Amino acid sequence: MNQDYMKTKPILPLVLSMSLPMVLSMLVNSLYNIVDSFFVARISENAMNALSLVFPIQNLITAIAVGFGVGVNAVIAFYLGTEDHKKAEDSMAQGLLLSAIHGIILMVVCVVFIPNFLKFFTNDPVVLKDGILYGRIAFSFSFVIQVGIAFEKIYQSLGRMALTMKIMIIGCVTNIILDPILIFGLGPIPAMGIAGAAVATGIGQTVPFILYLYYYKVDLPLRIHKEALESTQYYKKLYGIGIPATLNIALPSVLISVLNAILISYSAIYVVVLGIYYKLQTFVFMPSNGIIQGIRPLVGYNYGAKEYDRINKIYKLTLCLSLIIMIAGTLLCFVFPKEIMGLFTKNKETLDAGVIALRIISISFVFSSLSLTSGGVLEGLGMGIPSLIISLCRYVVIILPCAYILSSLLGPTGVWHAFWITEVFTAVISLLIYKKKKKDSFNL
């Protein structure tokens, strides 16, 4: 198993070869999110509202899987960089075991407590019924989500981006095909409504899980050993990176829930608008997030190999690529806001409110590229806490007080302005944190 190309191949071709498969797969995943919302919106406005309210918990489950997977990825990549194959294998085995445990716990907790969560935001019996039905089905697949994503991050740590791209695309396409069939029915298959959307999502997540089990048997160069499963040697290192990374990804769920609580006091329309925006934001941000996923193992490997100058070059290139993507996203939202929002709602009030929200919030995209890049590189270096500080600024410390104060002055529009104000301040903080850690760690 030779990963030397990670420290010898020219930077631009290396980053592109690692990132483009991830960008493509993340774009397909974003398309799934949009298609899912598109079909649910055709059921009713209440169904879309229910989906918007359940989304933060779904995001939390995925955040735990991806966040802990980032820890697994970083630890394995680091040990591969130091050429310690056994430690890479042992950390992989313990990472998979912990992911399985996370999945079982999340499934039980989320299925039991979803009614209480939804009642905090709405008393509408139809929305409650739809939300509980959708949530309980979707949460039943928590185990396959956790273990499947752990396998994905393991393969990414080995530089096997093309394989993870293919598997993710297969899962997403499965979901997209099943959505209209299970929601509206086809031939002998009955219409299941919002429950069909949840089942389609679950099947789309199970297919990659099964494929990863198959490829582990025939293709993975790292193996699971019984003695590694009986040890806790790498738990601290895995959680030391995984917990901050999980919080980084989970914090948007906290933000959405708090903003929903602020917006619902004005109208349920604004809750729907926020839910639609986050689906659209996923589409805009996923290319940048795909690049970040691609460079994490590069950063970890080069850090283990003490190739510090290459890490700095990777950071600068990633920032430039992210800026280009975010500028394009901002232009789309400014020029075509009505057309974009119109894909998800025909309600005139919701459409008008969404156009205003999209134009204001999209100002923040360009500034967010600095925060995303800095946080991603820091995670690749195994520096979870500094990355978490950046995310806390983006999703809690600055935006929540800002949204509360501005909403009291400007109404719902104040919440939208809080996004770009937060990103401006966080961009400055991110740059300062990264420069300090760079100086402390490798004197560049």
Set out the residue ranges of the language-model regions.
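Hydrophobic transmembrane alpha-helices of multi-pass small-molecule transporters
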Residues: 60-63, 107, 175-180, 209-213, ...
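Transmembrane alpha-helix boundary and packing residues in multipass membrane permease domains
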Residues: 22, 26, 38, 74, ...
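Small-residue-rich hydrophobic transmembrane alpha-helices
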Residues: 48-108, 112, 145-164, 260, ...
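Short alpha-helical transmembrane segments in multi-pass integral membrane proteins
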Residues: 1-19, 76-143, 189-243, 299-364, ...
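Helix-terminus/linker motif at the lipid-water interface of multi-pass membrane proteins
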Residues: 27, 31-49, 118-125, 181-192, ...
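Transmembrane helical elements of multi-pass membrane transporters/channels
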Residues: 17-36, 137, 171, 204-208, ...
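N-terminal transmembrane alpha-helices
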Residues: 6-38, 42-43, 59-71, 75, ...
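Short runs within selected transmembrane alpha-helices of multi-pass transporters and secretion channels
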Residues: 69, 138-156, 164-172, 197-210, ...
